[in-house]
Amino acid sequence: MAKQLLLLLLLFIVHGVESAPPPHSCDPSNPTTKLYQFCRTDLPIGKRARDLVSRLTIDEKISQLVNTAPGIPRLGVPAYEWWSEALHGVAYAGPGIRFNGTVKAATSFPQVILTAASFDSYEWFRIAQVIGKEARGVYNAGQANGMTFWAPNINIFRDPRWGRGQETPGEDPMMTGTYAVAYVRGLQGDSFDGRKTLSNHLQASACCKHFTAYDLDRWKGITRYVFNAQVSLADLAETYQPPFKKCIEEGRASGIMCAYNRVNGIPSCADPNLLTRTARGQWAFRGYITSDCDAVSIIYDAQGYAKSPEDAVADVLKAGMDVNCGSYLQKHTKSALQQKKVSETDIDRALLNLFSVRIRLGLFNGDPTKLPYGNISPNEVCSPAHQALALDAARNGIVLLKNNLKLLPFSKRSVSSLAVIGPNAHVVKTLLGNYAGPPCKTVTPLDALRSYVKNAVYHQGCDSVACSNAAIDQAVAIAKNADHVVLIMGLDQTQEKEDFDRVDLSLPGKQQELITSVANAAKKPVVLVLICGGPVDISFAANNNKIGSIIWAGYPGEAGGIAISEIIFGDHNPGGRLPVTWYPQSFVNIQMTDMRMRSATGYPGRTYKFYKGPKVYEFGHGLSYSAYSYRFKTLAETNLYLNQSKAQTNSDSVRYTLVSEMGKEGCDVAKTKVTVEVENQGEMAGKHPVLMFARHERGGEDGKRAEKQLVGFKSIVLSNGEKAEMEFEIGLCEHLSRANEFGVMVLEEGKYFLTVGDSELPLIVNV
């Protein structure tokens, strides 16, 4: 009996812990909270935040300027953790989330670079919706000390060697900005079209990072902590800044993270032009700005930009930064104040932004579980619907790079034996990429393939992904006896990750030798599956007829193994398209520190927009088991007249107007619509992304103008033989403009060409 009572008591204690409400302020059962204006939900958020800040002592104020903000018991304000991560699912990284209670896992979606390959912005939105909902579910379970998530990463994947390129949506600024908007709206609880569903209340807070021109971590001894990105005004305006502008203006993100690196000599977190004049002034940002972790300390310690710790504090607070990931502001703000390098007003400004976001999250409105989003149960985390979306995301992102003689899909009836070879075939962790959380469940590619061919034989092939040692003879012996061979190779987080950039684009170690040897020995052409984030030079495989099919699977998340096997055996028709250019190994001769996008003498440029060199695979490349055709049907206006009285002529004798001169009203009407007919001419139904590009008649001539630029993309599901019409809206200011050498966006007169696949349509712009 005593044991039974003890068990009941333990169950009660556990249940009590799990049922405890998450940390919050302004408990209505506390009579003192009625005296505080910051607890009154009928008052404007700004007024509530000002009231709270006014009640703090200077020491309390300073304590709140770091990511791990302590509680203020006398006011009933609990501790708060600003740092949580949710790049492609609620993650381990950051101290804000714990998976040690009711919730022990979260849906782990594909790494962003693969999700982007679907070119489906509504799917991106749905993924972020799920992440936001699961984040709130974890918080409601009492397993989170904050609801601010430092995602998405919307830096441009400028160089294929970048270890964090896997975290981004790719190399195109327009696409990256579109991803940012979809992610922010989904996570924060808005609708897909941007309507706020619950006034000013946030489901969770998104933070677009890393502001700005951050795309080098650690390359040949040069680190992000000291790197000074020399960026032209044109590249800043046309490539690096647009995703952040879109994130703020259209996504209405509640957070921004300033980067480690300097841009043209100035640390990002200490740049008032960047943080205050641009983000808050020009783009009307209303949220908080955090530093990357220890990005304040390096301004003095590593970069030597500031002459003292107090100067570093002054630099960032006066620039417009609000919270420091790290302890630097907690240690040095008091002395900076005493030395009159900062004022209490500078501190108050930061705190108003910080507490405003916490109020918007509902953390000063009483028990959050009784408020909007309070009904999101921990049981919704890892729900069947969420896991199904993770599988869909992997299916839709995977790219079929090569499929000679229609080797794929395999017939489920005719494959009697299968050899599965490679270091990435049976490792769960590799599927997840970085910034991942504990997945709901996982199936490796090997296990998924064995659901189709029970007696599939497996050999790792290499001692690890680094493949310094390869068991080539054993792998060859297995391949010789199999009906078909699938090689699952690529990279993992030992080869590309945060704080680690690659120095070449080849597959690691003896992987190429293993692949070639197995392909030569196999009875039939083999299938090569690449699990990796960044591009690799697989020219040897692309040009080898004994390697019949190549699949790029990114880091496909918890359901990636299933998605890969479904594509190989024809239960899903692949439709993903590359969101980055795949360069040859010779690209490593270009200095990674060279930030120029445009080509120049002896320099081929970067990304599909400006690159003039050889490619392994182009941006947007992706095959299917079906064939699709495109035909332009209608264009609302083939000649557009802007009638700009202030038109000018440039050195190329091309008339142009400034986009700023046209203004919002002018740009709103300078649009046209175009309809494209898409037909599935194959035998399988499929989901197909349609990409529309535009180019100026003089595009790419002198390096000033892009070769072409993406102006729209949509995804459509078509049955075999089915046709459908898709409408695209082309905004001249947004889609056809370019930056001049002064970083000013201009719209040039002349003939433009809209292209979808091999179809092309002229559009004439008259300034």
Curated annotation (Swiss-Prot):
Residues carrying a glycan: 100, 643
Record GO biological process: xylan catabolic process
EC assignment: 3.2.1.-
Organism: Arabidopsis thaliana (Mouse-ear cress)
Main location: secreted
GO terms under cellular component: apoplast; chloroplast; mitochondrion; plant-type cell wall; plasmodesma
Protein name (record): Probable beta-D-xylosidase 7
Recorded superkingdom: Eukaryota
Compartments (UniProt record): Secreted, Extracellular space, Extracellular matrix
GO MF entries: xylan 1,4-beta-xylosidase activity
Alphabetical keyword list: Extracellular matrix, Glycoprotein, Glycosidase, Hydrolase, Secreted, Signal
Enzyme class: hydrolase
Origin organism lineage: Eukaryota, Viridiplantae, Streptophyta, Embryophyta, Tracheophyta
Assigned protein family: Belongs to the glycosyl hydrolase 3 family.
SUPFAM superfamilies per the UniProt record, alphabetical: (Trans)glycosidases, Beta-D-glucan exohydrolase, C-terminal domain
Enzyme active site: 292
Family matches, as InterPro entries: BXL, Fn3-like, Glyco_hydro_3_C, Glyco_hydro_3_C_sf, Glyco_hydro_3_N, Glyco_hydro_3_N_sf, Glycoside_hydrolase_SF, Ig-like_fold
Signal sequence, renumbered to the chain: 1-19
